Curated annotation (Swiss-Prot):
Belongs to the universal ribosomal protein uL1 family. SUPFAM superfamilies: Ribosomal protein L1 (SSF56808). It comes from Pseudomonas entomophila (strain L48). It comes from the Bacteria. GO terms for cellular component: cytosolic large ribosomal subunit. PANTHER family: 54S RIBOSOMAL PROTEIN L1, MITOCHONDRIAL, LARGE RIBOSOMAL SUBUNIT PROTEIN UL1M. This is Large ribosomal subunit protein uL1. Keywords: Repressor, Ribonucleoprotein, Ribosomal protein, RNA-binding, rRNA-binding, Translation regulation, tRNA-binding. InterPro entries: Ribosom_uL1_bac-type (IPR005878), Ribosomal_uL1 (IPR002143), Ribosomal_uL1-like (IPR023674), Ribosomal_uL1/biogenesis (IPR028364), Ribosomal_uL1_3-a/b-sand (IPR016095), Ribosomal_uL1_CS (IPR023673). One of its GO terms (molecular function) is tRNA binding. Pfam families: Ribosomal_L1. Part of the 50S ribosomal subunit. PROSITE patterns: RIBOSOMAL_L1.
Length: 231
């Protein structure tokens, strides 16, 4: 059995395995634990009562968190004409068509979100092998293929998170930076869960939100007592 590091021992001494924590208690406890040498994020994992093997039970969406994620988001937009001007005015870091595609094929992929207007998909479609593995391929289901690229840029910059159930029916996303006020962090999580409930698959039976777990980037996951959330 691997030997625990000093940091792991210090963390193990402070947490109770299997305990369901009040949200504010969990957030405060996680923030008090020994940290990595960078500003960690708060991450949420939500176990859903869905069968991800069934296409009609795959949960996929995007939502703008009321207090953002604390991250600086770089956005590239494929569009042209007046929409290009609107995207730049909304804060896009790069706007283009074939020129932008050439840059990305050449390895310039320093973006967190890629957005496209429908008429630009003829160009974006050639980038599937480049953008797909990085989770950057624009998709109408999460609002990144849209004629209203300006609003999509504003949402991305405001802290919109995108998520999709994994093979175990769990969604994972960042909900803020360590250092966020617990109240603001809680409101971000509540907004996310409200969105999950809004798009609950009609064929999902039984308990839908089965478990909510809060963690930091390098820290342990703490089970959240859902009664401490206003959802």
């Amino acid at each position: 059995m691997a030997k625990l590091t000093k940091r792991q021992k210090a963390i193990a001494e402070k947490i109770e395995a299997g305990k369901a924590y009040n949200f504010e208690e969990a957030a405060t406890l996680l923030a008090s634990l020994p940290t990595a040498k960078f500003v960690e994020s708060y991450d949420i994992a939500v176990n859903l009562g869905v069968d991800p093997r069934k296409s009609d039970q795959v949960v996929r969406s995007a939502t703008v968190l009321p207090h953002g994620t604390g991250k600086t988001v770089r956005v590239a937009v494929f569009t042209q004409g007046p929409a290009a001007e609107a995207a730049l005015a909304a804060g896009a870091d790069r706007v283009g068509m074939d020129d932008l595609a050439a840059e990305m094929k050449g390895g310039d992929l320093n973006y967190d979100v890629v957005i496209a207007s429908p008429d630009a998909m003829r160009v974006v479609g050639q980038l599937g092998q480049v953008l797909g593995p990085r989770g950057l391929m624009p998709n109408p289901k999460v609002g990144t293929v849209t004629p209203d690229v300006a609003t999509a840029v504003k949402n991305a910059k405001a802290g919109q998170v995108r998520y999709r159930t994994d093979k175990n029916g769990i969604i994972h996303t960042s909900v803020g930076k360590v250092g966020f006020e617990a109240g603001k962090l809680k409101e971000n999580v509540e907004a996310l869960i409200a969105d999950l409930k809004r798009i609950k698959p009609a064929s999902s039976k039984g308990i839908y939100v089965k478990r909510v777990t809060l963690s930091t980037t390098m820290g342990p996951g703490l089970i959240i007592d859902q009664s401490s959330l206003n959802v």
